[in-house]
Amino acid sequence: MSAPRLLISIIIMVSASSSSCMGGKQMTQNYSTIFAEGNISQPVLMDINAVLCCPPIALRNLIIITWEIILRGQPSCTKAYKKETNETKETNCTVERITWVSRPDQNSDLQIRPVDTTHDGYYRGIVVTPDGNFHRGYHLQVLVTPEVNLFQSRNITAVCKAVTGKPAAQISWIPEGSILATKQEYWGNGTVTVKSTCPWEGHKSTVTCHVSHLTGNKSLSVKLNSGLRTSGSPALSLLIILYVKLSLFVVILVTTGFVFFQRINHVRKVL
């Protein structure tokens, strides 16, 4: 199985499971997978509810649990719980969506409800016990499914757009041919819009745009409007008609004026 298909399969499992985080196996209403201790690179779909699990340590052995949260463009946030005094403390934590799953003395896992592009970053849970310290880190990558659309432009080209995806989507064409241009537009929330333009000349009447993305692939087809090759756009045709009519009117006006002035000159000569 290829890497993109494997990742898509993981994302499908993420969206389909429902349970709680137990025994080192993270399972949430929208999100599930198995983690070992250490650092994990984790893709997560935007707008789901995600739970990040601590190392599977029994609460009776817990002394202190600390979550370190490092988000892009923000100061490091720390959420801590001390069992002896049943005290919680937060430092530089301003994101309201990132909270404990429940009371830290009952569940030390962290939840994000729901995930947004601003939650990209590194999360590490550190558990202090009489037997030593244990940690689990997550490199969280938020994925955004792009909106795909395909249309024909006025200059006999096909235009395919993958709007606000994260990461940037890849666009290919069927049948394969020369691509006029592929442009990427970056937005402040980390998403990217990809626009690809393909000439229609030399192709059949139908072309297909194939968009590849970590969240899934999508293909759209469009059939060339045969009238587009000869008559151009409706606006252009209207302008041509108006131009012809105006030209005829000017010719008639000039001819009539010329005849009128000729008659006046003839009458003056007779008098």
From Swiss-Prot:
Gene Ontology BP annotations: regulation of neuroinflammatory response
Similarity comment text for this entry: Belongs to the CD200R family.
Extracellular side: 24-239
Record's subcellular location: Membrane
Record-level GO cellular component terms: external side of plasma membrane
Boundaries of every Ig-like C2-type domain copy: 133-221
Gene, per the UniProt record: CD200R1L
Name recorded for this polypeptide: Cell surface glycoprotein CD200 receptor 2
Residue numbers on the Cytoplasmic membrane side: 261-271
Membrane topology according to the record: Single-pass type I membrane protein
The keyword Glycoprotein appears for this protein: yes
Free-text function comment from the UniProt entry: May be a receptor for the CD200/OX2 cell surface glycoprotein.
Residues in Ig-like V-type domain copies: 46-132
Listed transmembrane segments: 240-260
Disulphide-bridged cysteine pairs: 160-209
Keyword set, alphabetical order: Disulfide bond, Glycoprotein, Immunoglobulin domain, Membrane, Receptor, Signal, Transmembrane, Transmembrane helix
Signal peptide: 1-23
Main location per the UniProt record: membrane
Native organism: Homo sapiens (Human)
GO terms assigned for molecular function: signaling receptor activity
Glycosylation sites: 30, 39, 86, 92, 189, 217
PROSITE patterns in alphabetical order: IG_LIKE (PS50835)
